[in-house]
């Protein structure tokens, strides 16, 4: 006699089947809501997180109970028995699963904002004759005292440099040990400033730029927690008027004496940006390099309580804060597009022009990228601003239009997921042409390209060089690849012409931008700080 008819599944209890169908649904809905709000951009994201997390936990526990019920049901029936009428319940879960997959897809779709190609014929025509002026430098000759050099454009005005390495590679003047980090170095008044991480402490270090002798270091504890790529600081020190300003990977901002009389570093003021602005460090660490503008030092904490902040550079007192965007990885830059002095900031959600006096928003252009991956520094050329992002985003050239004193950003062209997709490094602009790495982050492939800024026309492309960072000097591109090579390429739109290379480091994460001052090139990886002699007349 079969016992299958006398055994009861939990689903035979009135209401239980419906309940156990609802609970897995709650699990999936909670999962979707949780991930939609996991890196919240606005209050809506926090709401999703608030409701999604408990739904997910409750639903997942219910899902385990449902699995046990399936096992109980299977054991209570013989495989040879005809399917009982109660087995109709297999259809609703199937339909429910299809519907929930569609719902999750909708949530993901709402979080993705693709761009489309655009070209404004009238603005492109005007661009052909437009002046592409660059910001004048106020730094003393022979300095590289901040991120990307005197004008934050990675262009050196030094000449008579040894940048043809096909016959003779450069001479290494010195090597010094350094700990982990991706930050570049700053050179000011014969001294070199760097940051790294030694164990659980971040450090600010000062070296003699000519000899490499360490003069002092300032160390402070810094818990990286779950920070991805936790080797060390990302932001480059800024040196100005006898003071050095730094930002660590978790948002510790310091102002130190650059040249202490007794040789002992002195902390002048400090801010813990993530705590003070009640926000979280981006998954890959705080990367904004401080910008000096007048009496202010400007950084980008990110988050709803002020994604950009300005402090009095002498006292450290907060002067203003602006925007509420999620943080990105770019650094601010100052300029005069549209004939108005402004701070241009590339956040995790868009590009903004801010009044340096009070942080008032002058204009805004949305540019949402996967992982908030807006990393490259904006490039200012006259009344135009060029931006570029990888992660399947693309690039755009914007004209900052001034009508009766009111500014707005108008796209000249937008290239969706093509032409130039800067990842870690920023292009350089020379003689109306962009030189940089177009990176496909889907397969981590990179193409070094030359692009005409005025026409968006690709002049040449080369796949032989691993992606890296680059600067311009004396008619050449000086490229440091992520696998530790230095490569020289002629900066001309005519054709790709390589002028030699030099293996500097055995590394797969050489991401720091080189710095050039007084004919010396300074490079680093996570272990070594190196100085190379690029002077033609050196012996």
What are these regions (language model features)?
Residues 25-79:
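Membrane-embedded alpha-helical segments of integral membrane proteins
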Residues 42-44, 48, 173-186, 217-238, ...:
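Extracytoplasmic beta-rich repeat domains
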Residues 111-177, 203-205, 213-225, 262-282, ...:
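Aromatic (tryptophan-biased) beta-strands that constitute blades/sheets of beta-rich domains
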Residues 189-190, 241-242, 294-295, 339-341, ...:
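Short coil/turn segments that connect the beta-strands within blades of beta-propeller domains
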Residues 201-204, 307, 353-355, 393-399, ...:
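Structural motif
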Residues 208-211, 257-262, 312-315, 355-359, ...:
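Short loop/turn segments that connect beta-strands within beta-propeller blades
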Residues 484, 507-539:
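Blade-level signature of beta-propeller repeat domains, shared across WD40, Kelch, NHL, RCC1
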